[in-house]
Amino acid sequence: LSNDFASDMRVYENDDSLLMKNFMLAALYSIEQLQAHSHLSIEDSAFFRGELERRYQKIRSIPASKELDEFASCTVGKNIFGCQNHSYGYAHVRALYGHSFEGHEDVEFGEAMFRFAIDDLSEDGALWREASRGAWSWKYTAIALGQLLSISEISRVSGSNVVEYRSPISGYTIHDA
């Protein structure tokens, strides 16, 4: 890893934050597979963890990645950066990082974001916070759903099973989205 590749971001700018999020997902999934097949030494794992940790802390600092109530305060026309698929993506990074490096709090955050999304479905099963961005944003609904399903798989392999979650608020499951 280059010491500066995907190592900094301006919190309210998509270009560098998306680069960092996507880099983190690719790196974490790669490390997960290398670890699963015993292709990383303890030293290699420590090196990668050190390189990823400082990048990860930047992602954790994004308002909608820290607190679900920040995400819940997103409304039409209000931009707290990451009210839609971006927040699901950051929760995906947090859950995967937690699974890879035994950060149960981070896996739980991903699960909480998953449950929030299901609780928040509109009557027609739409992720309305995504849809409220305008007609062009509908194409991002698939991205948001993919992030949520990835979180549910991380939850499953971590010993939980949010994919079966039925919202006590909306009555929906992920299958209704």
Predicted segments — roles?
Residues 1-160, 171:
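Aromatic-lined, polymer-binding surfaces characteristic
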Residues 163:
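Acidic/histidine metal-binding catalytic segments
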Residues 166-177:
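CBM-like carbohydrate-recognition segments
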